[in-house]
């Protein structure tokens, strides 16, 4: 949505966008979502309510693929609350292959009885309201959710978030050592979720369950804050 620019410009853009959408949105669900005040970008991380979010999808392109499940886990710098989290299997319009069923750790019966996304989209947005969303790889959750809202309601749903993959890239793939590796043709360090967690001594979890991956993302972010930032870091400095 936004071209690469200074972090202050990113903050200013999001604040303007939120204010515009709160007025312009015709859909009452999206209107309520945008009327929830955006967290002040100067608020320290220690005072922020976060929501880790993960989508499991049939592919990587929201134009041609669908959401099959989503998981949310609320947390702060002091605690992660998986018992207050949420997990939902979604019935896609396409038929899932046997490989996809196994990959996403869901069953045929779960898919058969699951609601379509349009029946649970309002619940998802309600749970995200008032929180700073944290994901691992922003080019899945935000565009899939945006396109789903646009298909259903004809309006966009965009919001600032924190991307633990982007944070990892910032610290693990920059600097003169990484530039030298690139010139020598050396493969860059992996910033996938499990590989990133291993660098912080975090345990390995079974992947591709949306709530488990949301939990893993929350834990990774807390470890990144301890190593690279501070509880007093302003939340706006990490917005994507």
Annotated model-derived regions:
Residues 155-176:
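Histidine/lysine/aspartate-rich catalytic loop segments that bind and position anionic ligands
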Residues 173-187:
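Charged, glycine/proline-rich intrinsically disordered loops and linkers
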Residues 216:
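Short active-site alpha-helical segment characteristic of glycosyltransferases
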Residues 213:
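Conserved catalytic/binding loops enriched for acidic/polar residues
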Residues 2-8:
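Intrinsically disordered, serine/threonine/proline
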Residues 230-240:
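Mixed-charge, glycine-rich, non-catalytic linkers/tails in nucleic-acid processing enzymes
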Residues 219-226:
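Short glycine/serine- and small hydrophobic-enriched flexible loop segments
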Residues 4, 14-152, 156-158, 184-208:
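Conserved non-catalytic scaffold segment of RNase H-like nuclease domains
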């Amino acid at each position: 949505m936004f071209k690469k620019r200074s972090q202050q410009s990113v903050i200013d853009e999001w604040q303007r966008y939120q204010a515009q959408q709160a007025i312009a949105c015709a859909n009452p669900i999206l209107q309520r979502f945008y009327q929830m005040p955006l967290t002040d970008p100067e608020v320290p991380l220690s005072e922020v309510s976060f929501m880790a979010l993960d989508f499991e999808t049939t592919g990587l392109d929201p134009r041609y693929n669908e959401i099959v499940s989503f998981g949310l886990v609320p947390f702060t710098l002091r605690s992660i609350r998986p018992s207050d989290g949420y997990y939902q299997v979604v019935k896609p319009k396409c038929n899932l292959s046997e490989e996809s069923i196994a990959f996403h750790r869901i069953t045929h019966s779960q898919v058969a009885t699951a609601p379509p996304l349009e029946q649970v989209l309002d619940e998802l947005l309600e749970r995200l309201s008032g929180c700073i969303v944290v994901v691992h790889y922003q080019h899945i959750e935000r565009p899939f959710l945006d396109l789903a809202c646009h298909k259903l309601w004809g309006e966009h749903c965009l919001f600032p978030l924190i991307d633990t993959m982007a944070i990892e890239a910032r610290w693990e793939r920059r600097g003169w050592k990484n530039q030298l590796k690139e010139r020598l043709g050396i493969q860059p360090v992996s910033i996938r979720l499990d590989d990133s967690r291993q660098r912080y001594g975090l345990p390995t979890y079974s992947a591709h369950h949306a709530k488990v991956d949301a939990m893993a993302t929350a834990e990774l972010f807390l470890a990144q804050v301890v190593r690279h930032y501070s509880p007093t870091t302003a939340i706006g400095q990490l917005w994507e």
